[in-house]
Amino acid sequence: MASKKGPAYMKKDKLITSRYDITLKNPDPHVSDRTSLRLAFVSDLHDRDPRRLLRLLKKEKPDLILVSGDTLERCKEGYQGHTMSEIDSYQEISFFWTVFCNILKGVHSILKKFGIAHDEKIGYGRTFLKRASKIAPMYLSIGNHEWYLLPEDRRLIKKCGITVLDNEDCQTEVKGVPLRIGGLSTKHNLEWLKDYAKKDGRKILLCHHPEYYQRFIVKYGLDFDLILSGHAHGGQWRFFGRGILSPGQGLLPEYHHGVYGNMVVSAGVSNTFFIPRFGNPCELVMLQVHGPSR
């Protein structure tokens, strides 16, 4: 289904662009399979500074920008009645991830007292949405750091013409190629997902959680042409190409980075708070998508 054209490293910015050729398995009799779409896939910005990412997107000139969640940090405990236990009931946070985060929080607090560490500034998510939407049409799904959207978020999204897919799908056309794009949220709606899978045409699913692949898509035999996920942050620490830990899959996650059948998992374009990466650069994923040869 996919082949990788080695990542283009940006040594100064420490951000890479990973490239994949994607062949959609289902032919469309109404579309020439010679038509190739250039899709930018972004995941896990976490409200961080988007300037490096925006420079790459402008250079790549994609036909669409697809974002699979955690663009914004909207997970304040108690806001609009949301609680940690509520959101955790939808996802399976592993014991090892919880212990790992608690240890790092303690170390980070100590280092801050000695001026060795500091909290990274956030609040850049809306800047990214505003500027990236001028590069190409954007489709956005919801991740586990987006329990809610603020009124100013919604106003900007509407003004910029960004399509938010919160357990929803839509029909669009790119370069004469009809596509359905859907977004499965952390607070998942399985009835919608099953209905979406039955629809005709080529279907892309933005699904922040790669662990939902086995939990829902494989379990219920659902059919999608392409699934785009993030969340695992590439396994956080990667040795010999193997991710070590992810929030939803625990130790040695099965889906952490790369191509798994019809699913592409991004290592993400940023980090969550202070968690370091080793052997696991942040990445923008560029997809060259076309139909099967006849």
Model-derived segments and spans:
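Binuclear metal-dependent hydrolase catalytic cores centered on His/Asp/Glu-rich metal-binding motifs
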Residues: 151, 155-162, 168, 174-220, ...
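Active-site neighborhood of phospho(di)ester-bond hydrolases with catalytic His/Asp-centered motifs
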Residues: 40-43, 64-70, 113, 137-144, ...
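Core catalytic region of metal-dependent phosphoesterases/phosphodiesterases
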Residues: 51-173
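Beta-strand-turn-beta hairpins that frame and shape the catalytic cleft
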Residues: 15, 23-40, 162-163, 170-182, ...
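Conserved beta-sheet core of the metallophosphoesterase superfamily
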Residues: 139, 211-294
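Acidic, histidine-bearing metal-coordination/catalytic regions of metal-dependent phosphoesterases
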Residues: 1-38, 43-46, 51-52
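Short active-site segment of divalent metal-dependent hydrolases/proteases
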Residues: 47, 72-73, 211, 234
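Short, conserved loop/helix-junction motifs that constitute active-site signature segments
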Residues: 59-60, 129-135, 196-199, 218-223
